[in-house]
């Protein structure tokens, strides 16, 4: 991906002198190090009181819940329901924010004497938010009252139906409301245009927490809503809302509670993941805990995650933790399967990669992982990506885009070609449905729309860098820790390290998309380096068994501990890099092109000198039969031969190779193929033949 580096503390920046004055004043007024004051100024914090509040958020960050529009109405309706001892159903969403919201209100309201049940719709069968079938089911079960969490503000027709049935509907949500609001009894959403609540960035679970505290203020009870603040922290972090104002306080208090006494289900999940409670950070919640909770809604039934979070029964908790781990493993496998298949489709059809918008489809792709795969492909190719799961009649799709390309604008422009049955979403993430026979039309339409809106514009990724750094010091990590929790609108401090020596590369992940290495800075700072999703930038270097080079690197420092040990080690998580003094012509396998990344196989075959000596000057395509469909392989072989490339087909055994040969030779002229059961190859064979079968 194209990237631009923006260094805040750049001595050549025209604002550098003024920023430095602000930092030094902050340093004196607040009593912090100059390093920490510089990090604060880089985040736009120059006022001493604002800095103190940011570093030590307290209850002064928390606003009166009754400042929110319709909060009084919602609380009054709930008190009436409680007084009449009527049943109340909490209708949630299947993501982490929705599940934690439902769990929070279920536990909190029941503690205060409400008769509540919870309902979370199926992602695959029901989709997002309220639906008439569920409403009908509630009425049949004598639930006359619905309380939505993290959804509902767009459910205009569904809420109208519920009201026609005589039901009470209270909406709590944080998504952008439509012009026409539903006819609910109360709509609590800080993003309402007529809402003057001071902070608009609450997650769904944050809005639910405000409702819970408001109800508690009207009831004589020993229940403390902050006893469930760990749920608020997890949902807020997972939903990627700004970690500012109230959110910052809620998340910090929630992490403190997780470290001391988390709810039973959360504690069991943390233990199963072999995470030390005292080491919990917002990053650990975002990348290790939240995905496991999310796996339930993605792959099966989000109610599994809900049951884990509300349960006190050890046996039930253990069962649900096990289910989440299995579902997450299944999610990873499905994600890998679709990701590699998508790469293979692009490889066989290079014109897809050349288009401004990549559109791919597959039979019954799992809807729960399409968004994740689309995100990875969008980052890989720096383009909008639309993935469609199709059956005989229809297709459901997920789209992701790099910054600078608005999917909603793109879809609105493309909709004039009548390809969408429906679509919705945000600037960088969207969903849609089409007729399955319209996939080619969709591809043409969105690319036309792109040209009309963006012409030849190529998106770029802007990397914000706090400052250049050469080494770390004793108070370095203590200062950084004071800025936590990190997340959206409060990112981890990002540092530039110039001209570091990097070696001992290892590639891992789907299609070998990530890499790890050892780094030594010019000041002899030695540490592990991790580059998630960055191996594509290595290009041909991925096939070099002895990578040894210098880089300018941008990333975040973290101190991590070995499980069940006091041993700590320093890691540097890369966001971007530039390779310095490396000549691509020195790469061992610069002429190799593969259908997917076969680094280990290529290095092993590279030890066969007779092959490398004779093919090093020509372009070579390589394939590993078990990993690629034969139709795909045949197409690629044909394309390679048309381009005058040699083709090496690698087999794990003679049996596999023999079977592959019998198929290939039915389509490719046998006179161009070299196959010998003993795999004996010499220079004469290599110079005369085009396709070679080799076992390892």
Which residues are covered by each model-predicted region?
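Hydrophobic helix-and-loop "lid/oligomerization" segment in the mid-to-C-terminal part
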Residues: 5-11, 16, 20-145, 164-166, ...
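Structural motif
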Residues: 43, 361-364, 623-628, 650-655, ...
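Terminal, basic amphipathic appendages of nucleotide-handling enzymes
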Residues: 1-32, 42, 46-57, 61, ...
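Short, ordered loop/turn segments at secondary-structure junctions
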Residues: 93-94, 121-124, 151-152, 174-177, ...
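Acidic, two-metal ion nucleic-acid-processing modules in DNA metabolism proteins
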Residues: 110, 248-291, 295-343, 400-407, ...
């Amino acid at each position: 991906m194209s990237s631009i580096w923006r260094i805040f503390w750049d001595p050549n920046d025209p604002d550098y002198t003024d920023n430095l004055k602000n930092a030094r004043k902050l340093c004196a007024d607040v009593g912090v190090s100059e390093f920490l004051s510089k990090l604060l100024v880089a985040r736009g914090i120059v006022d001493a009181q604002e800095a103190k509040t940011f570093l030590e958020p307290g209850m002064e960050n928390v606003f009166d819940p009754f400042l929110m529009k319709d909060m009084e109405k919602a609380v009054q309706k709930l008190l009436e329901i409680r007084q009449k001892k009527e049943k109340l159903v909490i209708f949630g969403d299947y993501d982490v924010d929705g599940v934690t919201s439902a769990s929070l209100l279920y536990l909190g309201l029941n503690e205060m004497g409400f008769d509540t049940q919870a309902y979370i719709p199926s992602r695959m069968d029901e989709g997002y938010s309220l639906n008439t079938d569920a409403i009908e089911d509630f009425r049949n079960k004598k639930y006359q009252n619905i309380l939505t969490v993290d959804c509902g503000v767009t459910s205009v027709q569904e809420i109208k139906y519920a009201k026609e049935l005589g039901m009470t509907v209270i909406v709590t949500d944080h998504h952008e409301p439509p012009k026409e609001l539903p006819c609910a009894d109360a709509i609590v959403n800080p993003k309402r245009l007529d809402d003057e609540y001071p902070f608009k960035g609450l997650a769904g679970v944050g809005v639910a927490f405000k409702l819970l505290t408001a109800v508690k203020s009207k009831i004589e009870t020993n229940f403390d809503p902050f006893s469930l603040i760990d749920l608020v922290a997890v949902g807020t972090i997972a939903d990627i809302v700004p970690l500012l104002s109230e959110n910052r306080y809620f998340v910090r208090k929630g992490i403190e509670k997780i470290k001391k006494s988390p709810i039973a289900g959360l504690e069991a999940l943390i233990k199963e993941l072999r995470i030390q409670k005292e080491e919990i950070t917002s990053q650990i919640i975002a990348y290790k805990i939240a995905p496991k909770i999310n796996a339930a809604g993605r792959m099966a039934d989000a109610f599994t995650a809900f049951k884990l979070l509300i349960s006190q029964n050890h046996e039930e908790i253990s069962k649900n933790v096990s289910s989440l781990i299995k579902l997450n493993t299944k999610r990873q496998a499905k994600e890998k399967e679709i990701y590699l298949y998508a790469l293979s489709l692009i490889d066989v059809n290079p014109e897809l990669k050349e288009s401004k918008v990549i559109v791919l489809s597959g039979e019954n792709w799992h809807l729960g992982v399409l968004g994740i795969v689309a995100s990875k492909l969008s980052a890989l190719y720096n383009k909008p990506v639309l993935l469609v799961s199709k059956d005989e009649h229809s297709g459901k799709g997920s789209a992701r885009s790099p910054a600078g390309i608005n999917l909603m604008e793109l879809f609105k422009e493309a909709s004039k070609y009548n390809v969408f049955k429906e679509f919705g979403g945000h600037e960088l993430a969207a969903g849609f449905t089409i007729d399955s026979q319209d996939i080619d039309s969709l591809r043409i339409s969105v690319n036309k729309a792109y040209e009309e809106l963006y012409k030849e514009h190529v998106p770029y990724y802007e990397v914000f860098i706090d400052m250049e750094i050469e080494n770390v010091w004793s108070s370095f990590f203590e200062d950084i820790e004071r800025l936590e929790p990190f997340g959206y609108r409060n990112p981890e401090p990002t540092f530039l390290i110039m001209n570091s020596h990097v070696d001992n590369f290892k590639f891992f992940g789907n299609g070998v998309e990530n890499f790890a290495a050892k780094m030594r800075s010019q000041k002899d700072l030695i540490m592990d380096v991790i580059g998630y999703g960055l191996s594509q930038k290595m290009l041909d270097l991925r096939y070099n068994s002895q990578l040894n080079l210098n880089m300018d690197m941008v990333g975040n420092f973290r101190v991590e501990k070995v499980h069940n040990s006091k041993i700590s080690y320093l890691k540097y998580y890369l966001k971007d890099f530039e390779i310095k003094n490396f000549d691509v012509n020195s790469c061992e396998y610069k002429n190799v092109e593969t259908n997917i990344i076969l680094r280990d196989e290529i290095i092993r075959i590279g030890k066969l000198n007779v092959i490398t000596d004779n093919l090093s000057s020509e372009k070579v395509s390589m394939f590993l039969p078990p990993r690629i469909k034969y139709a795909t392989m045949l197409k690629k072989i044909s394309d390679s031969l048309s381009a005058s490339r040699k083709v090496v087909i690698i087999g794990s055994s003679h049996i596999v190779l023999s079977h592959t040969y019998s198929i290939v030779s039915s389509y490719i002229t046998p006179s161009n193929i070299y196959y010998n059961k003993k795999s004996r190859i010499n220079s004469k064979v290599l110079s005369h033949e085009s396709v070679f079968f080799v076992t390892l």
